[in-house]
Amino acid sequence: MDAIQINPTDNVVVALRPLAAGEAVDAPGVGAVRSLEDVPQGHKMATRAIAAGDNVVKYGLPIGHVTCDVAPGTWLHTHNVATNLSGEVAYEYHPTHPVVEPVAPETFMGYRREDGSVATRNELWVIPTVGCVNEVARALCEGAQDLVGGSLEGVHYFPHPFGCSQTGADHAQTRALLVALSRHPNAAGVLFLSLGCENCTHEQVLDELGDFDPERVRFLTCQDVVDEQEAGHAILVQLAERARRCGREPIPASELVIGLKCGGSDGLSGITANPVIGRVSDGLVARGGTSVLTEVPEMFGAESMLLDRCVNEDVFHAAADMLNGFKEYFISHHEVVYDNPSPGNKDGGITTLEDKSCGCVQKGGSAPIVDVLPYAGRVSRRGLNMLCAPGNDMVSTTALTAAGCHMVLFSTGRGTPFGAPAPTLKVFTNSRLAERKPGWMDFNAGVVATGERTLDEAADDLWCLVLDVASGRRTSAERRGCHEISIWKDGVCL
C-alpha cells in the first residue's frame, strides 16, 4: 500500500512513503490515481478534481479549502490549501452517547500511599517556589543522589523562572500549578524550597495546600537558615527514610491515570501513533481507568469529534466554554486562532490547524468525555477527561502531571528528548525516525504504516509497555535524566 484514505468521504490520500511524479499510486478504496508531482511521505494528494474554494476533506472533515483548481494526483499543501478557521463558534450539542464495554483490568506493580492513592514511581521532589533558588535546588538534589536506592527511585528538582514579579491571576495560576504538582502520588516526599522575599510566599503555598501530611510535605526558606544546603539535605534524609517504607504491590490497572499528548507531529501522526494511543485510551477507560486529553488549540477544527461525546449538557457547555475561552485568549493578544502548525509540522505533511487537530484528537479514542478540568485542576472522575492547557509540549505535559497523570503517552513524528515529571513514553509515528533516533524512542508505531502490525495489534503492544512502565520500567527520557516542567504564564512581569 502506497497511500491511505483515512475516511471513505475524503478527497485526499496520505502518502505512506515518498511518491514520485508520474507514479501509479495504490490506495485501497480509491482506485487508480497517478501522482502529478513528487509527494513526500505523510503529505496529501488529491484523489479527484477540487474546484478553487472547495474543501479539502480528510478524516471525514474539512481541513481547509484549495486556493486554486486542482486535478487528481496534485500534491496538496501550504502552497494551495488555506484554513477555514476564524474566531469563536456557537457550538451545538448533538450527543452520540458512545458505549464502552467493560473489560476486566489487569494489575501492575505500583505503590499504594497511606491516603489510598496510587503511584508508579517512588521519588522525592524538590519544588522551588521561585526561580531565584533553582541552583540551590539543583545542588541539593545532586548532593542527595546517594539516598537513592532500595525502593527510593529518584530525587528530582523542577526549576522554573516564576514565583516572583507576578500579579493577580497569573501569580495565582503559578502557585496553583506548583501545589498541584506537590500532590502527585509519585512524589513520596516533597520539599518546597523558598527564598523568603518572593511573591509566592510560604504562607500562600500553605493556604493553597489546605490539609496535607506534614511528614510528606516539608518547607525550607533559604533566608531563614545559615546553611541552606545542610538544612535541605537533613530534610531530604528524613523524607528518604519515610519513602523507603513503601514498596511495590499489585494494583488494578483501573487506578491508572494516563495523559495523552503529541508534539512534533507529522502527516502520519493521525494514521499511526495517535490512533494507537486512542485505542490504548479506550482500553484503559474500558478497564475502569482514566485518560486525560489536553492541547486545547489543537482541538480547533476537530471540535465535533469531541463535543458530541460529552456525557451530558453540563460537560458539553464546560468543554465549549473552554474552547471558545482559549480562542478569546488568542484574540485578546491580537493573534489569529489558526496560526499553530510549526515548521516541523509542515515539513511532515500537516498543512492547516484543522489538519493537525483532526489528527491530534485521535489520541482521545472514542470513549465518552466525563469531565473538563481547568489548568492546574486535578482528575476526580474516572473516564476520559479534557484538560485546559496550551499545545506547547512542556507546558501541557506539566499540566498533565499536575492533574495526576501517572504517565504521559507522547506521540511524535519529529522526535523530542524531554520528559515530564511523570514518566513520558515517546511513541514514534514513523520507522525512519525510529531508525534515526532510537535513544529518544519508547515505542515505534511506524510499524502500522509499513503493514507490520495493525492498529489493534500495535495498541495491544503499547498497552503491555504501559503496564511495564507503570511497574517500574524506565522510559527513554527517564534513562537520560529528563524531568522538566514549564508553567503557563499570562500576565505582566513587574
List each model region and its residues.
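Metallocofactor- and cofactor-centric catalytic cores in central/energy metabolism, strongly enriched
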Residues: M1-M407, R414-P417, A422-L494
